[in-house]
């Protein structure tokens, strides 16, 4: 066993002696949660055909959580659960049709701020194959919002 391994074993043993009261007294850390490439089939677009037939939409999200107890407690209930965030975003994106990505991103941002403990949210929606008559790889819209602090 290498000497570094002995040091690591000692550190791990020391961690086992660390109790919950010590953890709660430790300084908190600012946390940002990012979700990249959430791919959903949706019905958004200016044309009736886009809204009827639908298309793949890719969403990227960033939530500024601020101080987060989970950095110390290691408990998912002490942070924003990114699986729940993805489920909520999918619900907003798929429950109705919007003509513009701007409105869709705004609706998602509003829902995230209302439902999760985030100080700021950033939402980017990308259409990988936009229905325009020019060679374009993708189009996207970004919306950034801050919590009202209530």
Question: What positions do the PLM features span?
Answer:
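N-terminal, polar/charged subdomain of small-to-medium soluble alpha/beta proteins
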Residues: 1-150
């Amino acid at each position: 066993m290498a000497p570094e391994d002995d040091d690591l074993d000692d550190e791990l043993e020391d961690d086992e002696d660390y109790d919950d009261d010590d953890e709660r007294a430790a300084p908190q850390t600012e946390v940002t949660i990012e979700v990249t490439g959430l791919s959903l089939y949706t019905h958004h677009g200016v044309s009736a055909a886009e809204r009827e037939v639908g298309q793949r939409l890719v969403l990227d999200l960033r939530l500024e959580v601020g101080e987060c107890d989970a950095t110390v407690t290691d408990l998912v209930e002490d942070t924003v659960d990114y699986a729940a965030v993805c489920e909520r975003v999918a619900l907003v994106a798929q429950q109705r049709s919007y003509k513009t990505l701007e409105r869709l991103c705004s609706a998602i941002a509003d829902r995230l701020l209302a439902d999760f403990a985030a100080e700021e949210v950033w939402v980017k929606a990308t259409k990988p194959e936009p229905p325009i008559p020019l060679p374009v790889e993708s189009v996207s819209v970004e919306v950034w919002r801050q919590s009202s602090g209530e």
